Each structure stands twice: as C-alpha cells, then as structure tokens.
Amino acid sequence: MQDINSGSSSMKDTYSSWIEISKRSLSNNLDNFRSILRPNSTLTAILKSNAYGHGIEPMTRLCIEAGISRIGVNSIEEALLIRNIDSKIPILIMGEIQNPEKRKDVLSDPNFWIVFSRPETARILSSFLPAPKLHLKIDTGMGRLGSHGETLKQTLSELKNVGITLGGICTHFASTEDVLEHKYSLMQTQKFEEAIFLAKSFGYNHLIRHACASASTMLFPNAHFDMVRIGISLYGLWPSIQTRLSLNLTGNKNFQLNPILSWKSRIVHIQYHPADSYIGYGSTFQTSYPTKVAIVPVGYYEGLDRKLSSNGDMLVLGKKARIIGRICMNMTMLDVTHIPGAEVGSIVTIIGQDGEESITADDLADRTHTINYEVMTRISESIPRIVVD
C-alpha cells in the first residue's frame, strides 16, 4: 500500500483511484471522544485490518501526531508495521498469537501488550527477555476468546503458581451495537468486574482494565475503566444506527462523528450508446434512451462490491450517476447522460461528498446488505492513501 503525504497529493493525477484521509476530521473525532472519557481513562486507537481500510501506516503517523499514546492491532505483522514507524509506542496485540516461541525475535518487546486466552501462551511469552506485557482476556458473554467460569479460576491459579506477571485484563461486549436495550452489556460489565475482583484475590491488584470499544465508550461511561479501545468511530463512522439512537436516548444528541475517508477516481473514457444497447458482462443492462456512458477505472478488485451492479451510484460534478451493468474486475460504467459537463478527467467520488450530494459507507452497506465495517475493510490496500487538510 502506498502512503502518500499531503505534499505529494498532486501525484494523484496518475492514479486509477485514490483515498483521501482528512486530518481535520480525525482530530475532531478524537476531541469528541476525549471529551466524554471518564477521568483516569485513556484512549487507544485501534488500527487493525489496515486501519479499517484507511491505511495503517498513514493512520499511525496521524494518530501519533494527534497525541495518541497507544495503538491496538490484530496481529504481529500489523504491530511490526507500526514499530517501524515508532520504536517505543505501546502496541496492544488483540489477536490470538500462534506458536509464539517461533516469534521470540520480534515479540521480545516490553512495549508490546499481548492479549491472551490460554495459560500456555502466557508461559511462553513471559519467558522472553525482555518480556511483553500480558493482558488476560475474559469471556463475559461473547463466546469467542477468553477465560470464564471455573476455567478462569484455573487460569489465574496456574499463572500465579508459575509466577507470571499480568499487565492487564480485558473483555469485549457482544451486542452493544445491535440493540436499544442493553441488559446483556450490563450483565457483561458485572461479570468483568467479578473477574477483576477474582484476579485481585490471586494478587493481581494493579491491572490495566479495558472493555469498551466505540459504541460502549459512547453509551457506558461506568465501563471506561482504565482504557477504551476506539475503532470504527475513530474514522468517523457510527457502529450502527442503534448506537446513534441509544445515545440520543441518553440525552446526548450533540455527539458528532466526521467520516475521515473519501474515495475518488476519474472518468477515463466516454461512450455514447443508442437506446436498446446492452452494457457490460452478461448483457444484464439495456439502455432505454440514448445514453452517455462514463468508464471509471475501479472495480471489485479495488473493493467495490459487485452487488452494486445496476444498484448503486457515484458522484460526478456534484450529481449522482447510476452504476449500469455489472461491475467489472477493474472498471465500472456510469450513466452520465444528465451530466453534460462529465468528460474524460472528471473526478468521480465513490465514497465522500461532492457539492450537496454525498455517498457514505453506510449507503453502500445498505445497498449490499452488509455493515460499514465490511465496506471499508474491503477497500484494496493497493490504492494510495493521501492525507489532506
């Protein structure tokens, strides 16, 4: 993935498409989250999965510049990308580490904070010199990773018996984004507090406690503990419509998120077709009037969902242009008959705003029956990311 700074943005004239990342919008989002954090709780920026499609390397630089003191990722490989940019910043690795003994050369980093579920993983990691910090994952109702119930007691006992030091304890909410009634999340919070109390009974008294992701940070201030993990909303996207409605119900109607990503391309070819012409693979679309067709060099390889074929729009000169025919691997066709000024070289907005019109990740998710997380993370790493404003 190319990471292009704002000083090189003129190079976008040569790209098939490019991503623009708004530094100002990122700063606004961070300020909004910092304003609602409980005292003594800190913010960790989650940059896993190529920073939710935004580009892990440019996002790392922007977050550090914005005063972020801790970054979270999924994998060792992601952590190493960040470590190449900053040699000291603490990095929370949340994905399960496989065969850690084979990665001793890179995991021997005291500023790696590694989340683990299995005692054997902790034993191996704690033997490294220097050893990474270890954060025990608690399954409070997600049913995925972590210890719970009698297994948790056994895990804590085993860790204590072999003298393993813990740096933190964490959990993850299962359904905060999906509901307006949050009894299950409150139950999870109670279970997490019980796990913290149990850990203290084994002598683990000064752990960094963290549970909240984006939605729960907005909705559950009592669960901020020592640290929150902000992912999707760092990038200005709501976790769900239910999250936004739930926040409104709490009386907080002023919390704002600003999407930081725009995805743009250019028209590379114009064709004129008479009525009753077929467009694209499979001849699935037939014109019903003389049609001006614009070709955009973006397709499903670049991350544009094929389900948007004849089912979506892009923006050209501030107007919506309908996608016609099947989206190709590297090209998409638009009906620009109603946009007289559309020509080769005209900028096309795939995600973002152009004049009074906008197309959001949520718009694309609604059209393709998925979530904004998937829309963003599908965007190809090969597309250059350019920092603007």
Curated annotation (Swiss-Prot):
Catalyzes the interconversion of L-alanine and D-alanine. May also act on other amino acids. One of its GO terms (biological process) is D-alanine biosynthetic process. The keyword Repeat does not apply. Keywords: Isomerase, Pyridoxal phosphate. It holds the Pfam family Ala_racemase_C. One of its GO terms (molecular function) is pyridoxal phosphate binding. Disulfide bonds: none annotated. Substrate binds at R144, M329. It is an enzyme of class 5 (isomerase). HAMAP family: Ala_racemase (MF_01201). InterPro entries: Ala_racemase (IPR000821), Ala_racemase/Decarboxylase_C (IPR009006), Ala_racemase_C (IPR011079), Ala_racemase_N (IPR001608), Ala_racemase_pyridoxalP-BS (IPR020622), PLP-binding_barrel (IPR029066). Its EC number is 5.1.1.1. It comes from Leptospira interrogans serogroup Icterohaemorrhagiae serovar Lai (strain 56601). This is Alanine racemase. Its cofactor is pyridoxal 5'-phosphate.
